[in-house]
Amino acid sequence: ESYLFCFEQPHDFLIYDKSYDLAGHRDISEFEYINDVGVKFYWATAVFFRKNETNKIFFDLLQHIQENWNHYRLVFQVGENLLRNDHVFSIAIHIMNGYQHGNFANKMPGKLFYTLDKDICWEISDNEITFLLEKQKYHGEYTLCKWKEHSIHVMNKYSLNRCIDKMEL
C-alpha cells in the first residue's frame, strides 16, 4: 500500500536510505555508510523512478560504475571486492549529488525491514513468513519470529529459495 504513494508524490527518484533489522540487536553501521569517508548507504532493494533524462543519466552511470567496479571501489574505499548493487547505487547517488549530500534521491515511503544471511527463512505460508533469527551472543542459536503482512528483504537467498521450492503453487 505504501508504494502507491510513490505515484502521488512529486519526486522523480525514490529509494530507501534507512532500514530495520528484524533481529533488532545487531550493529547496523554497514548500512549507514558504505565507507569511512561518508558516502551514505542506499538500498537498491526497492526503487521508484520516473522515466526522464536525469534518471537515464543515473542508470547509465550505474552501468558505468558496475563495468568499472574495481576502480570505483578503490576510489570510494569500499572494503569488499564483491560488487553489491547497494554500493553501486550509493556511489551513483553520491556522484549525482555533486560528491556531497544532496537531494537527487528522496525517501521511499514506509520502512524497509530485512533479515541477514545469518538468519534462516523457515517457512512461507499465505501472508506470513517464519524466520529463525540468530541470537545475540549465541552464534548458531536462533529465536523464532513470525512476520506478517509486511514486505521484508531476505538476504539469505538459499533459505528463501528452499522455502519457495516447498510452497504449493
Label every PLM stretch briefly:
Residues L22-N35:
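Short acidic (Asp/Glu) patches
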Residues E1-H25:
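GT-A fold catalytic core of metal-dependent nucleotide-sugar glycosyltransferases
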Residues I34-L169:
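A glycosyltransferase accessory/donor-loop signature
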